[in-house]
Amino acid sequence: MKTKLRRSSGNVFRDLGFPPREAENLRIRSELMIRLCQLIRQRGLTQVAAARLFGVSQPRVSDLVRGKIGLFSIDMLVNMLARTGAQVTFSVKARARVA
């Protein structure tokens, strides 16, 4: 059996077949969640300490570290990052049109 390789679009969610708008939303949320999880690890925080820092409950931090992406909005994730002193910036670019 031959395996076919495809070039990635750069968005794993798009590659998995999600509609473009949903794929982009999922990509952004996943990046924000990854950054929050990195921050927890870098600072050596317990889930309780992270919850206090982020202004959420410990079960919400558990959902975060378990990757429950559907439970978080971009707004919530940005607010959690802002409470850590982080500055969240976005860059909007026109996508190349595919013929």
Regions found by a protein language model. Give the residues of each.
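N-terminal flexible/basic segments that precede or flank functional cores
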Residues: 1-34, 99
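Short amphipathic helical patch at the helix-1/turn junction of helix-turn-helix
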Residues: 40-42
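Short alpha-helical DNA-recognition segment
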Residues: 44-62
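DNA major-groove recognition helix of helix-turn-helix
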Residues: 65
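Short, solvent-exposed alpha-helical "recognition" segments
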Residues: 68-73
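DNA major-groove recognition helix of helix-turn-helix/homeodomain DNA-binding modules
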Residues: 74-91
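Short, charged recognition helix plus adjacent turn
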Residues: 89-99
